Amino acid sequence: MEALKNTILEKTNKSLGVNAEDARLTLTYLSLAFIVLFIGGALGLLQGLNRAGLLELPVWLNYYQILTAHGVLLVLVFTTLFMIGYFYASLSHTLGGLLPKVRKMGWVAFGLLVTGVVFVVTTIIMGEASVMYTFYPPMQASPWFYIGLVFLVAGLWVSGIGVFINAASWKKRNRGKHLPLLSYFAVGAFVLTLLGSLGVTAEVLMLIPWAFGWTETINVMLSRTLFWSFGHTIVNVWYLVAVSAWYVTVPKIIGGRLFSDTLARLVVILSVVLNVPGGFHHQIIDPGFTQGLKFMHVFMSLSIALPSLMTAFFMFAVFERAGRKKGAKGLLGWFKKLPWNDVRFLAPMIAMIAFIPAGAGGIAQTNNQLNQVVHNSLWVVGHFHLTLGTTVVLTFFGVMYWLIPYLTKREMTTKINRLGIIQTIVWAVGMLFMSGAMHWVGVLGSPRRTSYTTYGDNATALGWDPYLFFLAIGGSLLFLGVILMVYIVFNLMFFAPKGNTAFPIAEPEDNASVTPRWTERWGLWVIVAIAVISMGYVIPLVDLILNAPPGSPPFKTW
Amino acid sequence: MKQAAYGLVLYIFLMLPPVTALAESIMAIHMHMQMPLFVIAGMLMTPFFQKKFPNLFSKWNSNGIPGIILFMIIVLYWMLPRTMDEALTIPAVEIFKFVSLPFLAGVPLRDSWKKLETRVKNIIYISLSAIFGFMAWLYIASPNQLCNNYLIVEQKTLGWGFVFLAACIFIYFIQTLFIDETEYE
């Protein structure tokens, strides 16, 4: 009886379009996400201007406070809010509505996230947590900052468990069927989030008693290692969220088909299994690890490039096939047949193009010797503004042009499309200037995580100035991009004309092969992932704990 | 047959002198990466042997029990601290490692697994996680150096590796009890 009721609900949902209650949940997440983007973007602009020596920041809101808030708000909060909103809408659409219990969990997660953000942002504004978004000890923030982080992680967990419950319930109601690809991505992304958050949870639980003064010292290297098992993973989670849109929605938007369902699912599995130990390459110049161990970890890090290259292969195949279907000739004729004037395609396409240099830069940084050259320089900042700030964020923007009208039962106008294209170009050019300048000046030695200084008019430091101007110009353009995007999002939400917008889901090819059953065996993949994580982390962690130095008392460097 | 070729490539790669030197320089990697990879190389090469000698497998391993027993004997043998030491100091034992893990553990494991009843598979899961748990206790708690070639701290690291391996196998076993794949079929 229950199954019948659910099937009826599912059918009604499909024919009537989006469930109003599910839409409200996602729209709430997305509204807050873009408000956060606006604040974080404004802070970014202030930072860029300060770095170029154009703006002196007041004592009560200094560079490091802004840097911490910018990082936390954009890297952790904006992305998390977007991910949950987007995936809950995807589940609602592809699985025929959220279960009432799961919807409730979505709201609980929202409450937890907002509470966490309030704690974190308040402590930063009070000047008690200028520890940057990596919150490395022995720099010590107020304990309430760390407690805020606990709420953020708890929000992620609750929303993740909601996704698993909804997916399992759908599978029980639809025996023998594969979970729809977009929901499959959601499950993969949240499995990865949960696995990745284990390390940082352990770290934060050690930091809280230390911040309260109940324990005197902290194991610095252990904390950094646990942090990066999370930090690197979570970046790859955002990337996986963006990739889900490339695989599932972009082919539909360009009038193509899904190239291979199996390949897409394999990419999800590989991303989940291989990702967590990759975090180690962020510590490649940390002391306390042997060279042999670092060398092993190069392989673990490089293995993540494999699913990315598979994605590149997949996307080119989709583009070429779609182009040829439209009559493209020659080796590269399909390139011209792509819908360049459709922002729903243009934004994710530029995101993908940006990932070519971004991914290559990442591979370069994974190598010990090359990392030594750029490690503490602005190069690294440039790198993650390309990966996260362009590849991930532009894809998120691209999703907005159809997801919001779909949820609000409105339509995107040609005017918004044109504005969206301008926004995308502004963003791309801004990032080209800013990230390009950061990469270049980084190689010349300009440090990251440092406010503007000429080091007593040292000639080398003065030589960085022209590049830092470009950084500021790019940053200003990016803030213009933020303003445009926030306008577009709220315009689509409240002012666009009523109408019907489809949720673009690519169909498989007519002669598509059957997706093998092993792709659904999450029990096995999670175990393999844990085994790979232990392969990567048991050796360094045991060494860091058993051969630990005396530990460090807290420092307040600001 | 592609799999068999990949298995062969992996097998040869693992035996290259710089690869063995690096893998064997760290105790945990020696036992928890190199040795399992040899087993995996053997598993990948299994289709080749099944095709080449179909009678051998159907005659001697009809229900999978002999194969899994052989697998367990080989795995247990390589878990002894002394055998690791000997693999490093006596070339003949090193060669035996290269031969036994892929061909006497990997091949029979893959040939047997599909033939085994669920009950036997459960016994294997439980005994492997119990043995790994015991090895974890041994390597972590032992106050003495068990291998001449590795330090006590490496020994403890290996012990923690065993904790995770035992946990992985046990969690996998538990989820097979609770998640009935046929419910989703």
Role assignments for model-derived ranges:
Chain B
Residues 1-185:
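Alpha-helical membrane segments of multi-pass proteins
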